Swiss-Prot record:
This is NADP-specific glutamate dehydrogenase. Coiled coil: none annotated. Homohexamer. Belongs to the Glu/Leu/Phe/Val dehydrogenases family. The gene is GDH. It comes from Tuber borchii. It catalyses: L-glutamate + NADP(+) + H2O = 2-oxoglutarate + NH4(+) + NADPH + H(+). GO terms for cellular component: cytosol. Keywords: NADP, Oxidoreductase. The keyword Oxidoreductase applies. Its EC number is 1.4.1.4. The lineage of its organism: Eukaryota, Fungi, Dikarya, Ascomycota, Pezizomycotina. One of its GO terms (molecular function) is glutamate dehydrogenase (NADP+) activity.
Length: 457
């Protein structure tokens, strides 16, 4: 019996990796399979008390965390999350996934994740600023441009990054690239807000091209997207740019489903972006805008997956475990051929099993699954490019950053595809498993670096 506390989110991510490495032709993998016990514990876990003052002059206490998972490939890199559900299991899962995701980008970045159970919702700007300064008072002892470079995540946007960066500069008397996601006038990168959504669509574009032998693109594809935050918004805009049709968006209160052939347009996405900036919900937009009432149906409390008649591509972009086993079956029944995750661990393990079984049984006619650690690595890729710009004291153009992002996502696709073809027997007409390829590629790269640095022998 283990004496460790249960960590369900971390265990799910770990089990997925183990399944991929041991499932089929593990004899082709050398002794590194025995290193699962070495690669799963983080190098360091930092936990601390955050005491801050609210607007009434009362002190409040939250927990702060930083999980520095693996630095074999570079400085720890991964976001900070401020949300009441934050705990060590979630942060270990995210740091574990981040390690292999960062490896797939080809950039020199390790993996980490951090945050607090502080809830920024309902807090004033002054309360958030005071919390950020208190949080950074301890975190600043453990991070730096050559050590650990955090970024934003849920609950940590541009405002919070600004306060955290200001606190770090105040405590350390140093202006350095210690955080990414900064404002463009003080060390940030263009295309950073768009990066995860754009990168997701670039990745799926390569899936479509490979599966069709180069004959198909996004043009004319019906695309179901969940979420309506940054990832979903920019994924939708890039799909529209490439000629696809966006037929769903959602938030925590419900889903909008297109009732006709038109789907969402750029103006709709702009309205949704403004709504979300004001922390509103899609139900408000559907109730207030006649154009939304006439073209979309709103389903309170629902996710979109079981409510689309025909769909070609699904992009879960809201939160973890947002596609269940039954929803996976419904998507396949609706004709979905490609599913890639814009959200971290967007599908349950049961749903992933459904995807993979369909890929094997129906071969080229089945659903092809792109896992989060590969498909949504565009955000951290541009964070890596921001680090490069900070080191050079330069700011690249939007076109240059977007070109670099597109190249990284193409390399990431092939970094997943080629190991899947190398390590596993693939039946004639069957598409390679990208989830297995991603897990193997990231894992092998990390453990080989660990061996070169003397972590195992």
């Amino acid at each position: 019996m283990s004496n460790l506390a249960p960590e369900p989110e971390f265990q799910q991510a770990y089990n997925e990796l183990v399944h991929s490495l041991r499932d089929q032709n593990s004899s082709r993998l050398p002794q590194i399979l025995r290193l699962l016990c070495l690669s799963s514990p983080p190098e360091r876990v930092i936990q601390f008390r955050v005491t801050w003052e609210d607007d009434k002059g009362n002190f409040q206490v939250n927990r702060g965390y930083r999980v520095q998972f693996n630095s074999a490939l570079g400085p720890y890199k991964g976001g900070l999350r401020f949300h009441p559900t934050v705990n060590l299991s979630i942060l270990k899962f995210l740091g574990f996934e981040q390690t292999f995701k960062n490896a797939l980008t080809g950039l020199n970045m390790g993996g980490g994740k951090g945050g607090s159970d502080f809830d920024p919702k309902g807090k004033s700007d002054n309360e958030i600023r005071r919390f950020c300064y208190s949080f950074m008072r301890e975190l600043s002892k453990h991070i730096g441009q050559f050590t650990d470079v955090p970024a934003g995540d849920i609950g940590v946007g541009g405002r919070e990054i600004g306060y955290l960066f200001g606190a770090y500069e105040s405590y350390k008397n140093q202006f350095e690239g210690v955080l990414t996601g900064k404002g463009i006038t003080w060390g940030g990168s263009l295309i950073r807000p768009e990066a995860t959504g754009y990168g997701l669509v670039y990745y799926v574009a390569h899936m479509i091209s490979y599966a069709s032998g180069g004959k198909e693109t996004f043009a004319g594809k019906r695309v179901a997207i969940s979420g309506s935050g940054n990832v979903a918004q920019y994924a939708a805009l890039k799909v529209l740019e490439l000629g696809g049709k966006v037929i769903t968006l959602s938030d925590s209160k419900g889903a909008l489903i297109a009732t006709g052939e038109e789907g969402f347009n750029e103006t709709d996405i702009e309205l949704i972006a403004k709504l979300k900036l004001d922390r509103g919900y899609l139900t408000q937009l559907h109730a207030a805008e006649d154009s939304f009432k006439s073209r979309f149906k709103y389903l309170p409390g629902e996710r979109p997956w079981c409510h689309v008649d025909k769909v070609d591509v699904a992009l879960p972009s809201a939160t973890q475990n947002e596609v269940s086993e039954q929803e996976a079956k419904e998507l396949i029944a609706s004709g979905c051929k490609f599913l890639a995750e814009g959200s971290n661990m967007g599908s349950t393990q049961e749903a992933i099993n459904v995807y993979e079984e369909d890929r094997k049984s129906r071969k080229a006619d089945g659903l092809w699954y792109g896992p989060a650690k590969a498909a949504n690595c565009g955000g951290v890729a541009v964070s890596g490019l921001e680090m490069a710009q900070n080191s050079q004291r330069l700011t690249w153009t939007s076109e240059q950053v977007d070109k670099e992002l597109a190249g990284i996502m193409e390399r990431c696709f092939w970094n997943c595809l080629n190991p899947a073809k190398e390590y596993f027997d693939i039946a004639e007409g069957e598409l390679p498993s990208l989830v297995a390829g991603a897990n193997i590629a990231g894992y092998v790269k990390v453990v080989n670096a660990m061996k070169a640095q003397g972590d195992w022998w």
